[in-house]
Amino acid sequence: MQPMTRARIAVDAMGGDYAPDEIVAGALRASEELDADILLVGNPVPIQRYLDEHAPTAKPQIVAANDVVDMGEEPLSALKRKPKASINVAMDLVKAGAADAVVSAGHSGAAMAAALLRLGRLPGIDRPAIGAVLPTLLPGKSVLVLDVGANVDCRPKYLEQFAVMGSIYSQYVLDVENPKVGLLNIGEEDCKGNDLALKAHQLLRQNRQISFLGNAEGRDVLSGQFDVVVCDGFVGNVLLKFAESLGSVLVQILREELPRGWRGQLGTALLRPNLRKIKQRIDHAEHGGGLLLGVDGICIISHGSSQAPSIFNAIRLAKEAVDHRVSERIQACYQDAVAVEDQA
């Protein structure tokens, strides 16, 4: 399958703590640096005001959507009350074929619900999952963890599907040959874990569509041993939030431990290039957001506190998923897996 020449990304300009200014800023950078068409979805007045002040020559496409789902609202009821909310309109663009992907830093529950209501699940997929790319100890190597929040309660079958979807993403977007899959558990032994882990382990071991290495303990997730780690959304979200805190904790420790006075200033100056590289490896903003796998379209859910750099990276992530036809590959691979099981 050949990559699409130019991805069309619908950006929810009204979603997030710093909307619309930081969202528009990240989208403008993406329109300049990425081979993609950006559609800004939201209230045209503040969007245009920002453009007039900061990028008067820019001419991005603005799709009007005057409502927004606020963080404190219940997702389903808000989506029904506000059919013209920015996240609804963005999803409708994908459904109508006017866009290839959605990026939103708004209400994550609303983004997931809108994707399910507007786009629907891929045939054969029981539950979509949010996948987050995390850094590992090995330079240039990442690990995809899913689910990190879409499903707090899971069945063993769901985890098996997460592994299939994650393997496809890892292979085609992260360029990992034969991705190694691990099941997050409390021990390496096959007999360890609760009922969900034990039953999921059996399914993963039997699945011929993936390369299942076995159980992954918490200490193994960032070791580089695994390319894909699957778990339920409750555990995954806790893991994600913990991993996201590591960067700020490390920076704070370095600040406290560096000597004061001129020695500290000199040490900081000498270490600055290395500290910048460390930050790039561990900063969650570098990865942009989580990919909602299993819906009939590409949807990136960014952190609510995302600013322009994170939005840019989220759009880059969406473009990569579109170019590599992740949704189509998931559907095809899952259908192949079903056919193999039927023949067995």
Curated annotation (Swiss-Prot):
As its record notes, the protein acts as a catalyst of: a fatty acyl-[ACP] + phosphate = an acyl phosphate + holo-[ACP]
| Enzyme type, top EC level | transferase
Disulfide-linked positions: none
Alphabetic keyword roster: Cytoplasm, Lipid biosynthesis, Lipid metabolism, Phospholipid biosynthesis, Phospholipid metabolism, Transferase
One biological process term from GO is:
fatty acid biosynthetic process
Q: Name one GO cellular component term.
A: cytoplasm
Q: What is its EC number?
A: 2.3.1.274
Give the Gene Ontology MF terms in alphabetical order: phosphate:acyl-[acyl carrier protein] acyltransferase activity
Question: Pathway, per UniProt?
Answer: Lipid metabolism; phospholipid metabolism
Principal cellular location given in the protein's record: cytoplasm
> Does the keyword Transmembrane feature in the UniProt annotation?
no
What the entry lists under Gene3D superfamilies is as follows: Isopropylmalate Dehydrogenase (3.40.718.10)
User: Where is the protein situated, by its record's location annotation?
Assistant: Cytoplasm
Q: Which Pfam families would you find in this protein's record? A: FA_synthesis
Q: Which family does it belong to?
A: Belongs to the PlsX family.
**Assembly and oligomerization:** Homodimer. Probably interacts with PlsY.
Q: What's this chain's function?
A: Catalyzes the reversible formation of acyl-phosphate (acyl-PO(4)) from acyl-[acyl-carrier-protein] (acyl-ACP). This enzyme utilizes acyl-ACP as fatty acyl donor, but not acyl-CoA.
Protein name in UniProt: Phosphate acyltransferase
Native organism is: Thermosynechococcus vestitus (strain NIES-2133 / IAM M-273 / BP-1)
